């Protein structure tokens, strides 16, 4: 009887805590609307990204866009101010940053996140606190299926990635696939959607394996894979663990081609070592695209930074310009005004292609590109 009373009390306390927390974010949302409806020319935008870990072009793309928008009055008389936070792939930091942004009643929008897990948690917080969330990196399919009003995604969702990836895989002759995935919101979703895509193309999944980020040991896996008749291994997980897998696989002489869901980050290169050579991964941006918008972007970026832009430079640059266009169109700092303006606007032609959103805030379509590492450098597979 005491145990029953204990569990009833515990569940009651948990429900009370969740309700009060939700109510707190709701109150913050009401306060945000009050503040942002007051006249002001400044629009505050939060940014959350693992800058120190990824060391990519995200910050540079943002800064270039910010300078253009503010100097050329592209936000219709408003100026944008960025509050930039580095989450360092640290779960505690990620939660604190999301709460910090939700607590700021003067903030209109947030740009981020990279990883699906913290993005899912943050999106619920931002929805409750009425804060526009521009997702530029996280792909989880379900994030835009809850009827949220404040989320807009400028990158493909996992189901759309997987459909394209399955076609690319089979078009390159890979029809017997081993699928490995990380047990998280990104890895599981992408692996499942990829298998659905393969089933529709009559390709065969010959082996499956999952791993936890907290307890990774690939020794048994790579030896088992040597015994599997697979044309290709699909690794549905991110860096740096993907690099550890490549190193372990090549160490035992596993020569099967690997297609991964990772990015070309410093951590990935360090963890993979020489085993990185020949690895294949997909990307969302082609720096050599011949569209006028991309050619101009690449030239400006190279002139300013002395190097070509990467995916996240293009993604962040476009996201801030999309937001500026919504601010100019609405003349508002209100997150709901901006969210609807983005969803229902005509297609935006950016550095990274065409952006058109559906009613749920999901990006409708974009090309997907395959890259192979040759002499340590990603090379586009034609």
Where are these regions (language model features)?
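Extracytosolic ligand-binding ectodomains
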Residues: 2-382
């Amino acid at each position: 009887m005491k145990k029953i009373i204990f569990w009833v009390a515990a569940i009651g306390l948990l429900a009370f805590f969740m309700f009060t927390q939700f109510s707190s974010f709701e109150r913050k949302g009401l306060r945000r609307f009050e503040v942002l409806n007051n006249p002001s020319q400044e629009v505050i935008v939060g940014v959350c990204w693992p800058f120190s870990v990824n060391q990519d072009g995200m910050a540079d793309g943002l800064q270039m866009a910010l300078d253009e928008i503010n100097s050329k009055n592209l936000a219709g008389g408003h100026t944008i101010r960025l509050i930039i936070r580095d989450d360092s792939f640290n779960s505690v930091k990620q939660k604190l940053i999301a709460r910090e942004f939700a607590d700021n009643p003067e903030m209109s929008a947030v740009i981020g996140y990279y990883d699906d897990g913290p993005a899912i948690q943050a999106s619920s917080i931002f929805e409750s606190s009425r804060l526009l969330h521009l997702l530029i990196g996280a792909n989880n399919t379900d994030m835009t299926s809850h009827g949220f009003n404040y989320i807009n995604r400028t990158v493909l969702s996992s189901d759309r990635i997987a459909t394209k990836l399955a076609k690319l895989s089979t078009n390159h002759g890979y029809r017997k696939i081993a699928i490995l995935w990380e047990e998280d919101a990104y890895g599981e979703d992408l692996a499942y959607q990829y298998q659905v895509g393969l089933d529709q193309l009559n390709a065969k999944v010959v082996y499956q394996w999952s791993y936890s980020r907290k307890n990774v040991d690939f020794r048994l896996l790579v030896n088992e894979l040597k015994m599997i008749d697979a044309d290709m291994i699909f690794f549905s997980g991110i860096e740096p663990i993907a690099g550890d897998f490549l190193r372990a696989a090549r160490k035992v002489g596993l020569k099967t081609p690997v297609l991964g869901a990772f990015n070309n980050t410093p951590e990935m290169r360090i963890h993979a070592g020489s085993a990185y050579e020949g690895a294949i991964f997909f990307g969302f941006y082609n720096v050599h695209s011949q569209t006028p918008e991309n050619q101009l972007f690449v030239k400006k970026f190279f002139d300013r930074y002395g190097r070509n832009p990467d995916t996240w430079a293009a993604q962040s640059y476009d996201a801030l310009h999309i937001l500026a266009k919504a601010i100019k169109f609405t003349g508002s700092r209100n997150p709901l005004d901006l969210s609807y303006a983005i969803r229902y606007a005509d297609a935006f032609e950016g550095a990274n292609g065409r952006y058109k959103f559906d009613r749920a805030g999901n990006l409708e379509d974009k090309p997907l590109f395959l890259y192979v590492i040759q002499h340590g450098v990603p090379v586009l597979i034609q």
